[in-house]
Amino acid sequence: MLQHAPTLTRLVGELKKLPGIGERTALRLAFHLLKSPQNLGSLAEALTQVQERVCACSVCFALTEQNPCPICSGGRDSSVICVVETSQDMLALERSNAYHGSYHVLQGAISPLHGVNPDDLRIRELLMRIEQGKVEEVVIATNFTVEGETTALYLARQLKPLGIRVTRLAHGIPLGSDIEFVDPATVQWAMKGRSEL
């Protein structure tokens, strides 16, 4: 591609490793960065700082710069643990301002097709947290995908014998949507999960 510029070729190759970035977008980004050297320097500095400063919280395994993270060390309700797949999921829940307990980030979901087994996730650490503390409820907030559902079922089987309340995030028809436009699987889940008024 760029035989005369192996460094640029390497940059394009590294950018292509990012999710959603193909050859053309990587090339466009590389040339954009080269047009403004101050942006290139800022990006390089930010990447270096992230590599040096961001780590997994030793309690909940969320990405943080402070260990334990501000949520784990900030006096949140530790009797309820919300289990999520990723730090991004945790941030989405935090943005909603609907939950004020603690978290546990599994760092993935069970996916035999991709070689991810329960031992590859932070499930053992979750069980240890429950055994050590005064946990009354675990909210399973894994994604509503095949992998997320598999993980939720596995967690429920592991947690129920411990005598704590195990709940799952509700799922169904999104607020503000018309039923006629909702897919059949979502309508089925909504019917199964209906509640009394």
Curated annotation (Swiss-Prot):
Any GO molecular function: zinc ion binding
Keywords: DNA damage, DNA recombination, DNA repair, Metal-binding, Zinc, Zinc-finger
InterPro entries per record: DNA_Rcmb_RecR, Rcmb_RecR, Rcmb_RecR_Znf, TOPRIM_dom, TOPRIM_RecR
Keyword flag Zinc-finger: yes
GO BP, sorted A to Z: DNA recombination; DNA repair
Zinc-finger keyword on record: yes
A UniProt-annotated Pfam family: Toprim_4
Zinc finger intervals, C4-type: 57-72
Domain Toprim positions: 79-174
Gene3D superfamilies: 3.30.60.80, 3.40.1360.10, 6.10.250.240, RecR Domain 1
Task performed by this protein: May play a role in DNA repair. It seems to be involved in an RecBC-independent recombinational process of DNA repair. It may act with RecF and RecO.
HAMAP family: RecR (MF_00017)
Similarity section: Belongs to the RecR family.
Protein name: Recombination protein RecR
